[in-house]
Amino acid sequence: MDEMAILIDVSKCTACRSCQVACKNWNQLKAEKTTNRGSHENPPDLSSSTWNRIRFHEAIKDGRIDLLFINERCRHCAEPPCVAAAEDVPGAIIKDPAGPVVITEKAKQLNAQDIRDACPFDIPRFDETGQIFKCTMCADRVLNGLKPACVQACSTGALSFGPKPAMLALAEKSM
């Protein structure tokens, strides 16, 4: 299988959050109790039960509020710093040739904060037991020829999925 990638085109994102819901549903992640903080943004951050979220940036421009959206999730780096940070426990975090960066059961032997600190995007999260969580790119779906749940759910075309060279070409074309 070719290396696969997700392309995020923020210019097409309407912040409907269907990607968040699809991720929670597919991965059977529990709902989080949140409070209204005066923003449309919810939940407030990634967590052990929120692996994908839309972050809102509110900017005032010409007297009006512009909402800018950023999809926060694991970037499934070409050379993942989290994999390098986990080298003391071989196989704890792997970069699958198909694209996903996957955390295995062996990761329980790692210091979760060290793994989070290694990520330049501050993505991995951990629970009270120290177990590490992050977007898996729906590796179980991808390895069976399906799109990640978030991409399948995106009705605006903000999320695209395919072979990495095709996604890079699509990104270049849209710039």
How does the language model describe each region?
Residues 1-175:
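Non-ligating segments of multi-cofactor redox enzymes
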